[in-house]
Design a protein with these regions (language model features):
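Rossmann-like dinucleotide/flavin-binding elements
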Residues: 1-4, 39-50, 61-74, 82-128
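N-terminal Rossmann-like dinucleotide/flavin-binding domain of flavoprotein oxidoreductases
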Residues: 6-54
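Gly/Ser-rich helix-loop-strand patches that form or flank binding pockets
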Residues: 78
Length: 128
């Protein structure tokens, strides 16, 4: 990755979750303030880390989305949550969302939301 935040970078795109922009900004600021040496998008070995004399090492590898074993999952009309949130693939008008966890709800909210996010417009927020 070329920026910190991981899944927050997806979540901040969901209407009503724009506060994650601030979460990422806060952590960037704190890392800078504390002089934390952050290195992104690097492959390292144990020897690389040992030889640099760090006091502590945090390895944040991120996640790999789970792909369910469902017949047809590889069909061109099937869109994963990352592509849906990032707007990489068009989403039709009739959609089945598989999964009732937080990500399923976020994708549903994103693809059914019309107009400006209430979190960004006080007048819209007051009407919701």
């Amino acid at each position: 990755a070329d920026e910190i935040g991981g899944q927050f970078n997806l979540a901040k795109r969901v209407p009503g979750k724009e506060e994650f922009h601030e979460t990422i900004r806060y952590y960037n600021k704190m890392l800078d303030k504390l002089n934390v040496d952050v290195r992104l998008g690097k492959r390292v070995s144990a020897a690389d880390l040992r030889d640099q004399g760090f006091d502590h090492i945090v390895i944040a590898t991120g996640i790999t989305p789970r792909v369910p074993n469902i017949k047809g999952i590889d069909h061109p009309m099937v869109v994963g949550y990352i592509d849906a949130i990032m707007g990489r693939k068009p989403i039709g008008k009739k959609v089945a969302v598989v999964g009732a966890g937080g990500i399923g709800f976020d994708v549903t909210d994103l693809i059914t939301h019309e107009g400006p996010s209430a979190a960004l417009d006080i007048d819209v927020f007051a009407k919701e």
